[in-house]
Each structure stands twice: as C-alpha cells, then as structure tokens.
Swiss-Prot record:
This is Structure-specific endonuclease subunit slx1. Its cofactor is a divalent metal cation. Belongs to the SLX1 family. The keyword Zinc-finger applies. Catalytic subunit of the slx1-slx4 structure-specific endonuclease that resolves DNA secondary structures generated during DNA repair and recombination. Has endonuclease activity towards branched DNA substrates, introducing single-strand cuts in duplex DNA close to junctions with ss-DNA. CDD domains: GIY-YIG_SLX1. Residues 14-97 form the GIY-YIG domain. One of its GO terms (cellular component) is Slx1-Slx4 complex. A zinc finger (SLX1-type) spans 225-280. Its main location: nucleus. The lineage of its organism: Eukaryota, Fungi, Dikarya, Ascomycota, Pezizomycotina. It is an enzyme of class 3 (hydrolase). Its EC number is 3.1.-.-. PROSITE patterns: GIY_YIG.
Length: 406
C-alpha cells in the first residue's frame, strides 16, 4: 500500500469501481474484485492479457462482467472510503461491520423471513449483500451508481428490491446497461455506455472544465465568493468554480459546502452530494468539483501538460490566409507559448503504444484512492461547447487481489 502522505498528494483518480464477474461456462461461479479499468481487468481475467486472478483461470473462462458499482470518492474528499476494503466487505459480508443492524431502515429484510447473513455464494446472495451495503449508514451517503450489463442479473435485482422493505437512497442510481432491456425512465438513458469497453476511465471528460477554472482563477483580482461575498485567493484558499459552461460563479469550498448541506433534507450528512449553484442555480455534483479541485491543486505538471496539448491542438486548426502561401502549414511561436519545461500529453490506461511518448507526464503507480463519478449532464454540456483534443491521462492503480469464486 502506498505511503499515506504520498497518496494524499495525488489527484483523485478518474474512475474506480467494484465489479462482479460470472463464468459463462459455469454460471454458478462468481468473482468479485475492484479496478480502475474494467475492460482491461476483464481481459486479464479472460487470459487475453497478462494479469487476472488464479481463480478466474482456465476452465471457467470466458468470464462476463455482469455489474459494477462505480462512483467511489477518495479519502481526501472526506468520505473515508477505501475501495479495497469495500470489495472485501462485499466478498465477506458476515465479517463486515457495515452489514449489521445499522441498515438504512429499521426493517430492511426480506418480508416474512429472518435469517443470519452468511457467506454469499449464489448470485442472489451477492445481490442481497450488495443491496444491504448500499442501504447501510456508512455507504448510503456515497454518490454511487450500480450499472448492470446482464439483463437476467438486473431482473433478479429488481425482484429482490421489490421484496425487501429497505430502500436504496434516491441519489444512488441503478443503470440497466449492456444487454439489459432498455429502461425509459427519465435521467437513465443518457447514462448508458453500451458495454464495459466503452466506460470512460480517464480524465478527458474534465479537460475543458480544468481549462476553464485555470484561466478564470489565473487573474483573481475582483473575484469574490458568491456565498460570503469576500475576496477569493486561489493560491491560498480552496476555491471552487461552477462546472457549467456559461457560469463563472466562484466560491470558497467551505462556504459552498455549508450552503449545500443547509439545503439537504439529511441533517446528519457531513459531505454534500449535490446542490444548486448560487450563480446559475443549476444542480451541480460535489464529486465533480472535488475531482477538478484535486487535479488543479495536486497535479500541477499534469494540468499544464493538458493545457499545452490542448493549445497545440488549437494551433493546428488555426485559420491561415489562403494567399499567404509561405505561412501555410506553419504554427507561430506566439500561438504555443507554454514553457518548454512543461510536459506533453498524458497517456490513458492501456494507451502506452502512442508514438509521441517522449514528453508524456504520468502519475505515479503508488496510489489507488477512489473517485466519485462526474455529472454526465455537466460533462455533456462541456463536450458540446468545448471539444477537447484526445489527450490522455494514465492512472496506474492496483486491482483487487481478493479471490472469491463459487
């Protein structure tokens, strides 16, 4: 495990999830793990690439990833959540203090039945324990999503959910994806990705957001906190910027946090899930702002590399007068004025084959804190009005080593 001081100086990872595998050869064989890169990890389990786990080898292959739980926040975001431990708790629920009597309801059990919770070997047992984890006092406050890729597993989940008295918090979304029957309920369709391979696991979704905040805070003169009206000093204070494209609202972290918490119905909550921006009054996700803040304050070299790469991309598409043939295809020095000491592109997971790796800047491989997923509404808004160049960020994070097959 990484040194605590080192881990807490790294940006929040772009993606981290827990997953459930099922053997397509022996469907009673299940495996639970955690990873920052689901498609890469699935390929490892199936022997396509090196890695994987001993209990997912040979006669039980190929495996399918039937569901993932995504949206984990880092400890630096104050949610006190360790993704490795969460996986362990899901695998060994009988030994987890989070699956005791502190579920989110007083009678969160299957109607008409009471029995001690033992090791979950069946698919139904794993789903029961996952449901209980999401209802528990500790985990119900996290901005999580449960994404199903197999329709039969999703249907079993729905049947179990209908039979139990306990309810998962409204902010925890259940997304039928992959082969699941398309669910037309509002707010779900735009979340579908289609397959494990299409899950976005890098920082590219927040590149334009990072660019916006960097340039907005570069000249802090006359900037004021929208909540307390006091001046903001980005170099000395933790400052948040609204992720909405056309909103330039700036707030102190503590001021905005207090405002969001004051507006929630859950008076016992310590960390916000979301809230309305005091500037544009649109709902924004706390986890998205925390990811941007951590990258801006802890990943200075990586941030400058993103900006430099984006600047180069803008230079390539810069209009050149047709009659001035001597300048066609050239890029002026003034157009790309970033310091030469700044690194270049940042690779994404599995993209090490890129030819232009001589100036890449990479994050260290000794950190694995988890991240809450970004708001897709906000990301879609950014993508339409600020098309980003295909820069990539590599996150080298250890996968879970815990084996649990039935």
């Amino acid at each position: 495990m990484a040194n605590v001081d080192d881990v807490h100086t790294k940006p929040i990872p772009a993606f981290y999830c827990c997953y459930l595998l099922r053997s397509t050869v022996r469907q009673t064989s299940l495996y639970i793990g955690s990873t920052p890169h689901p498609s890469r990890r699935l390929a490892q389990h199936n022997g396509v690439s090196r890695g994987g786990a001993r209990k997912t080898a040979n006669d039980k292959r190929p495996w399918e990833m039937v569901l993932i739980v995504e949206g984990f926040m880092s400890r630096t975001a104050a949610l006190q959540f360790d993704t490795i431990y969460t996986t362990w708790a899901w695998q060994k629920p009988g030994k987890s203090r989070h699956l005791g009597d502190d579920d989110n309801t007083e009678s969160a059990r299957e109607k008409g039945k009471t029995r001690p919770r033992g090791p979950a070997r069946s698919l139904k047992g794993h789903l029961e324990n996952l449901h209980a984890l999401l209802r528990s006092t500790y985990f119900s406050g996290l901005p999580l999503r449960v994404r199903f890729f197999a329709d039969d597993v999703h249907q079993l989940w729905r049947v179990w959910s209908d039979r139990i008295d306990g309810f998962i918090p409204e902010h925890i979304k259940v997304i039928p994806d992959g082969s699941c029957f398309e669910n037309r309920q509002p707010g779900i369709e735009y979340l579908r990705v289609g397959s494990v391979e299409h899950i976005q696991v890098d920082y590219s979704k927040i590149h334009s957001y990072l660019e916006k905040t960097t340039f907005q805070l570069d000249d802090p003169e006359d900037l004021q906190c929208k909540v307390c009206q006091a001046p903001v000093v980005p170099k000395e204070e933790l400052v948040l910027v609204c992720p909405q494209t056309r909103c330039y609202c700036v707030s102190h972290l503590l001021c905005l946090s207090a405002r969001f918490l004051d507006s929630t119905k859950d008076r016992g909550r310590l960390i916000p899930i979301s809230g309305k921006c005091p500037g544009c009054h649109k709902t924004i996700q706390w986890s998205l702002m925390m990811q941007e803040l951590s990258f801006r304050t802890r990943g200075a070299k990586e941030l400058q590399a993103i900006l430099r790469k984006k600047k180069r991309g803008d230079c390539r598409v810069k209009d050149v007068p047709e009659k001035d043939t001597d300048d066609v295809g050239t890029v002026t020095a003034e157009c790309c004025d970033f310091p030469e000491s700044v690194g270049g592109s940042i690779e994404g997971p599995g993209d090490a084959s890129d030819e232009s790796t001589h100036d890449d800047v990479r994050l260290d491989d000794d950190w694995y804190e988890s991240l809450g997923i970004e708001s897709d509404h906000e990301i879609a808004d950014w993508s339409e009005s600020h098309p980003a160049m295909p820069t990539r960020v590599e996150i080298v994070i250890e996968d879970s080593d815990c084996d649990n097959t039935g």
